[in-house]
A protein has these predicted regions:
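Short alpha-helical donor nucleotide-sugar binding micro-motif in glycosyltransferases
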Residues: 275-281
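Short hydrophobic beta-strand element within catalytic cores of glycosyltransferases
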Residues: 306-309, 319
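Conserved donor-binding/catalytic core segment of Leloir-type glycosyltransferases
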Residues: 4, 188-205, 211-214, 226-228
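Aromatic "clamp/platform" in nucleotide-sugar-dependent glycosyltransferases that forms part
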Residues: 289
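Donor nucleotide-sugar binding/catalytic pocket of nucleotide-sugar-dependent glycosyltransferases
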Residues: 146-180
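Nucleotide-activated donor-binding/catalytic signature segment of Leloir-type glycosyltransferases, i.e.
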Residues: 236-272
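Extended catalytic core of nucleotide-activated donor transferases of GT-like folds
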Residues: 4-6, 50-159
């Protein structure tokens, strides 16, 4: 049996974190299934993020990725194979646009052709609302996808209205089993009430409400601190992003002198530093408008932390 798993392995977005979780799980059991010829194909919308992929993840990507054009071509041409494509449904079409994406090892391959050329293809999809966009429906139908794999019951219920769907949760590594490394922060967070948020900075994550609510409640409390770990959106300069954040922070009017109790972290942090922030926090807060699963929230729940989040979405499965 030949199986190729296509995903954004060498990025730092939510889809890449989920894909690496599945890849580690597959790696842990693959030796028990020698009949499976398993390979991966990795794509990215931002080649700059490759430098932020942890070395141990790169080693695992290298272990299963096609190392040469010849190896890839032979795999696709010699005998039938099945395909898993783990991404938003429109990514194969987006990658048809010249210079919009990067293929790992600079190999030459067409994502739509890889999917269509498979004996059976399975689409692994997380979505944030209770209805799929029309372009997603059209893409899934166009590839004659056998089954859509959903990481949450919320997603499965949504997808099952239109397509055959199977529920397979994302893989979460328990924070209590991971090493952590203390992080030098501009504020000493020891003995403080720490609110922690980890996510990409997009409108859907509703950071504006989080920042405003924290300031309204804790602006004059020196024993409370909000720690936000995020990344600068694409095509936005660091200077512009920080300026916008300060405007957001300063736009909240409060009746008394405010404390300097918000920490914004935008630089790359290794896994041990992230684990430290999870361990140090008292509350994980992500008031998102919609989540298909939310790996950061799941990791906080795994660590036994208090959670503040929206009452609907994929994350409700495990809260």
């Amino acid at each position: 049996m030949k199986l190729v798993y296509c995903a954004q392995f060498h990025e730092t977005c939510g889809y890449s974190h989920a894909a690496m979780g599945y890849l580690r799980a597959i790696d842990s059991v693959l030796s028990d299934h020698p009949q499976v010829n398993f390979k991966i194909l990795s794509l990215s919308f931002d080649v700059r993020t490759l430098s932020s992929v942890p070395p141990e993840d790169l080693d695992l990507i290298e272990k299963y990725h096609f190392s040469s054009q010849g190896e890839l071509d032979n795999f696709l041409k010699e005998g039938e194979y099945n395909c898993i494509w783990h991404m938003t449904s429109v990514v194969p079409d987006l990658f048809e646009i010249k210079n919009i994406g990067h293929l790992y090892n600079n190999l030459s391959w067409n994502l739509r052709s890889v999917i269509k050329g498979s004996l059976e293809n399975y689409h692994l999809l997380a979505w944030e609302t209770d209805e799929l966009p029309q372009e997603y429906k059209e893409a899934i139908s166009r590839y004659n996808t056998k089954e859509v794999i959903a990481p949450s019951k919320w997603n499965k219920d949504t997808i099952s209205k239109i397509f055959k769907s199977k529920f397979i949760p994302h893989v979460i590594e328990g924070q209590h089993t991971e090493k952590n490394k203390q992080l030098d922060l501009p504020i000493n967070i020891k003995d403080k009430f720490v609110v922690f948020c980890l996510s990409e900075w997009v409108r859907r994550k509703n950071f504006n409400s989080l920042v405003k609510a924290f300031i309204c409640e804790f602006h004059d409390k020196e024993d409370a601190v909000l720690v936000i770990k995020t990344s600068i959106p694409k095509r936005v300069s660091q200077e512009s992003f920080i300026s916008s954040f300060k405007q957001l922070r300063d736009s909240v009017r409060v009746p008394s002198q405010r404390e300097n109790n918000i920490i914004l972290l935008i630089d790359y942090l290794d896994k041990e530093n992230i684990n430290y922030l999870y361990e140090a926090c008292d509350l994980f807060a992500l008031p998102s408008y919609g989540e298909g699963f939310s790996i950061p929230t799941a990791q906080a729940a795994s660590a036994g932390k208090n959670i503040l989040c929206s009452p609907v979405g994929g994350h409700v499965d495990y809260l």
